[in-house]
């Protein structure tokens, strides 16, 4: 049956790593797209599942910031097909202390310790995650597991169905340590407050951005958002010729980073803001002021925005090599390997 079940279902607004990790292991990927409300239709999931379905890997809320309130219906559909459900909780920043993966009937979940639990992204890292599974799946976990017998901690290696060791099984230790101390210092009530403030900050920013000329939220038929929002500059681009890349470059001059979106760009001219709980109202207002100035310039002097940034050591960065597997290399060893291959 394991060989027969060779398909993983995900959604286009789930984190791309959900599809990528499964694809690396040889699974065929089925991707569900959103309806007019920004969410995949349960009927589409019913059509996608079959005797070939191994599992569902989904992020909720998705990267639009929209929470799928029908998530238990999704897990039931997949379970009824004999498959498993994995919950990518990369966007848990707005859910801590409010809802859990188990309550949505997931079999597995994983958290980004480098994002939701105090460690900064740090230019794409240092990434590390915590994986949790139902009791029935423990025997399949990588080894070693750390267990506490009531008196001392110990490594456990005797898992009958284990996949064995994985590279870097300790994770990025500083990120793990920071996450542990942060969780213990915050406590249950503190973690819930983190989520509440993250949602509050995000919705404050959203209301302000919706007043900006040329900016809109994606999927406006669903007005509510959790901890982030996927916006669109489509109207701004149509009216001024200024693109989301141009706005991003201009924000650099004010000392701010503005992120667009994962690829492919389902939302046209996208930009995504996830304020988290860390920033004060004054800091958010400063960020919004930079964005407001950029929009004003776009309508009054679009070339000024298009030629930005002006206060950066790198005037323009060519991002195209990052989309070409033959050119990019994330380690020195990978770089040397590709150089040798070219020769």
Region spans (language model):
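Generic hydrophobic alpha-helical scaffold/packing signal
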Residues: 7-9, 19, 46, 62, ...
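Catalytic-loop motifs flanking and including active-site residues across diverse enzymes
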Residues: 125, 171-178, 225
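Acidic/His-rich catalytic or pseudo-catalytic neighborhoods
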Residues: 62, 167-170
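Conserved PLP-enzyme active-site core in the AAT-like
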Residues: 1-154, 161, 241-242, 268-269
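Short glycine-enriched loops at secondary-structure junctions
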Residues: 13-15, 172, 264
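Short, well-ordered loop/turn and helix-capping segments at boundaries between secondary-structure elements
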Residues: 24, 51, 80, 103-107, ...
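Non-catalytic terminal extensions of PLP-dependent enzymes
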Residues: 99, 149-166, 176, 183-343
